[in-house]
Regions:
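Short amphipathic, basic-aromatic surface patches that mediate peripheral association
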Residues: 33-46
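Short, well-structured beta-strand segments within conserved domains
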Residues: 27-31, 77-90
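Short beta-strand segments within Ig-like beta-sandwich modules, predominantly Fibronectin type-III
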Residues: 61-68
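Short acidic/polar inter-strand loop motif in beta-rich domains
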Residues: 64, 88-97
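Short beta-strand elements
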Residues: 98-111
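Short beta-strand elements bearing conserved aromatic residues within extracellular beta-rich modules
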Residues: 54-56
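Contiguous beta-strand segments within globular domains
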Residues: 21-35
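Short, compositionally biased P/S/T/A/G/V-rich stretches that sit at domain boundaries
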Residues: 1-23
Length: 111
């Protein structure tokens, strides 16, 4: 995870879930985040509670950052692939609520 940002009492406590649907040759991933605002403008700058960006991983490999709640994932080879998203602060620390990283995963099965 690297550096973390433990959410303090009274601060927004982000939650996350994922959904995925076929889209063309690939997939449309929807990130459903509560108490969290995606912000490209402040990425790499100062921390604002409840604000930041996501990191997306497929099969444990980081694909990049998410600055909005939807992303297209290109075609995947046959098999089952785990897609994971973490929520991170503007200054790139991983959000942690009650000792647990704010992350969600979903599997994509390609026949």
């Amino acid at each position: 995870l690297g550096e973390i940002c433990a959410v303090g009492e009274g601060e927004p406590a982000p939650e996350i879930s994922l959904s995925v649907a076929p889209e063309g040759e690939g997939w449309r991933l929807q990130v459903n985040a509560e108490d969290f605002q995606f912000s490209k403008e402040l990425a790499g700058l100062y921390h604002v509670p409840g604000m930041g960006h996501g990191h997306i991983y497929v099969g444990g490999v980081k694909l990049g950052r998410l600055y909005e709640p939807e992303v297209h994932i290109g075609a995947l080879p046959q098999g089952t692939h785990e897609v994971r998203v973490t929520l991170n602060t503007n200054d790139h620390r991983a959000y942690v609520v009650d000792g647990t990283p704010v992350t969600a995963a979903i599997s994509i099965k390609v026949d």
